[in-house]
């Protein structure tokens, strides 16, 4: 994915950016800019390196003070939406930290064309009071700005600087999430769910308490809670299970839990058959299977896969067949040897079988 994004910062993009910046400022040294950007190292530069390299060269070849540079960028930003537009907030991140108020206004503007979620983070680390600005943004009419108020303060945002102060104490974030948990835009409330999921990894009880407070509020908030608690649900946390009505699993009998093959080659797939029956009163069940993958060092690592969540009537019986694939992925390398697969009902492992990869 990084390779694909890297290629968005193409020679054509650099040429278009050069023309547009020159159109908006006669001070811009377009010839030196394009020569220095597309240097001998350009082809080998990775994603973030290309982005930082471009913003550095804008700064070097636009001989104005910072605020006047931003005025020029403000005229160009609307032409470069999407990922390539991140060079504009990146410019603010690299060169605007000593002019907070002006820079924050620029980030608020630029996020409406790409995203300022990465660029805002050094400002939050530098000055924790900026969380109050993000709270104000949570009331903004523009949904991109509202999303930034949540996404920008996620403690563990992927590809981004970790915000240690919120990993340690996420309470300053909560007023923003309280305000946005029922937002009309899914782009916004998805960010709330992801922020809470980040928090749950270090403060599970805090997120569970919020869950009790928010449950039943609306369909949107129910969706937010389910996704906010996804890590705890996969871990089988009983309080998270109970919040969604998944309690005792004793009445669900496992009639069959089997793999079509117990010996497979790496790259092959097989089928998993699950036959179950509810022998008790009607109840909700969350069904998952977990594979214990053999690691290179000889230990095992569990990965949980959801099958379904549904209510079973008394005496209801079901047979489920799932495809289980063992081809290597960019995120998972398989190793020959003993593996395990187990069935989880309402977060509790119920049955485990062994199989071998070769």
Model-derived regions, located:
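Proline/serine/threonine-rich low-complexity linkers at boundaries of modular beta-sandwich domains
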Residues: 239-254
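Short beta-strand and strand-turn-strand segments in soluble, beta-rich domains
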Residues: 252-255, 296-309
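Short beta-strand segments of immunoglobulin-like
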Residues: 258-265
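Beta-strand-rich binding/interaction modules
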Residues: 269-277, 281-297
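Short acidic/polar inter-strand loop motif in beta-rich domains
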Residues: 328-330, 344-353
């Amino acid at each position: 994915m990084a390779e694909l994004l890297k290629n968005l910062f193409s020679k054509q993009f650099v040429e278009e950016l050069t023309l547009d910046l020159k159109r908006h400022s006669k001070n811009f040294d377009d010839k030196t800019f394009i020569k220095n950007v597309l240097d001998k190292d350009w082809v080998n530069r990775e994603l973030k390196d290309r982005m930082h390299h471009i913003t550095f060269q804008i700064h070097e070849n636009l001989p104005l003070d910072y605020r006047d540079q931003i005025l020029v960028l403000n005229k160009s930003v609307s032409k470069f939406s999407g990922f390539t537009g991140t060079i504009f907030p990146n410019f603010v991140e690299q060169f605007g930290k000593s002019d907070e108020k002006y820079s924050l206004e620029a980030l608020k503007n630029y996020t409406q064309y790409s995203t300022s979620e990465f660029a805002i983070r050094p400002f939050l680390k530098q000055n924790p009071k900026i969380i109050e600005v993000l709270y104000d943004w949570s009331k903004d009419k523009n949904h991109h700005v509202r999303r930034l108020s949540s996404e920008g303060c996620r403690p563990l945002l992927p590809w981004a600087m970790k915000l240690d102060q919120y990993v340690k104490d996420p309470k300053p974030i909560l007023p923003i999430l309280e305000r946005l948990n029922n937002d009309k835009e899914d782009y916004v409330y998805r960010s709330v769910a992801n922020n809470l999921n980040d928090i749950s990894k270090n403060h599970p009880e805090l997120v569970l308490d919020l869950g009790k407070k928010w449950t039943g509020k609306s369909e949107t908030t129910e969706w937010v809670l389910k996704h906010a608690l996804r890590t705890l649900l996969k871990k089988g946390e009983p309080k998270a299970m109970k919040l969604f009505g998944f309690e005792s699993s004793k009445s669900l009998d496992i009639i069959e839990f089997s793999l079509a093959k117990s010996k497979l080659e790496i790259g092959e797939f097989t089928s998993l058959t699950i036959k179950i029956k509810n022998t008790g009163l009607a109840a909700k069940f969350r069904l998952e299977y977990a594979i214990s993958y053999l690691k290179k060092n000889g230990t095992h690592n569990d990965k949980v896969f959801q099958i379904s969540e549904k209510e079973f009537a008394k005496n209801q019986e079901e047979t489920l067949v799932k495809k289980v694939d063992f081809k290597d992925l960019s995120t998972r390398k398989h190793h020959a040897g003993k593996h395990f697969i187990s069935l989880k009902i309402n977060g509790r492992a119920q049955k485990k079988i062994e199989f071998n990869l070769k």
